A protein has these predicted regions:
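Hydrophobic structural segments
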Residues: 1-107
Length: 108
């Protein structure tokens, strides 16, 4: 595929449980690795898929934001050997403001 300038991409949609970042990462890992195995170079996951989109008031709780950051760290470590660029959505707090963000990582 590279001979023609193409990049193999994959969009994966894991089962998401609202507020359960660790469980959501558990659901993402086999999908990410399954997409990387046949050669996907870019793997995109949904917006806010680490925490779930409909957290509502939970987004104001430090515990949810901290669990999302920890879960992202785990996801990065467990995907270090796949070689693909992975893009995943999560809430990020910066200077007291909450943002709906996408984290992109490759090779840990």
């Amino acid at each position: 595929m590279k001979d023609f300038g193409f990049v193999k991409t994959a969009a994966v949609c894991p089962r998401v449980t609202v507020g359960a970042a660790d469980k959501n990462v558990d659901n993402m890992l086999p999908l990410i690795k399954g997409a990387a195995a046949p050669g996907a170079q870019i793997i995109a996951l949904p917006e806010l898929c680490i925490t779930g989109y409909t957290c509502s008031d939970l987004f104001s709780q430090d515990r949810l934001i901290e669990s999302a950051e920890t879960a992202l760290g785990r996801l990065i470590l467990e995907c270090a050997d796949i070689g693909a660029l992975v893009i995943v959505g999560l809430p990020v707090r910066v200077r007291g403001r909450l943002f709906n963000c996408a984290a992109a990582f490759q090779n840990g």
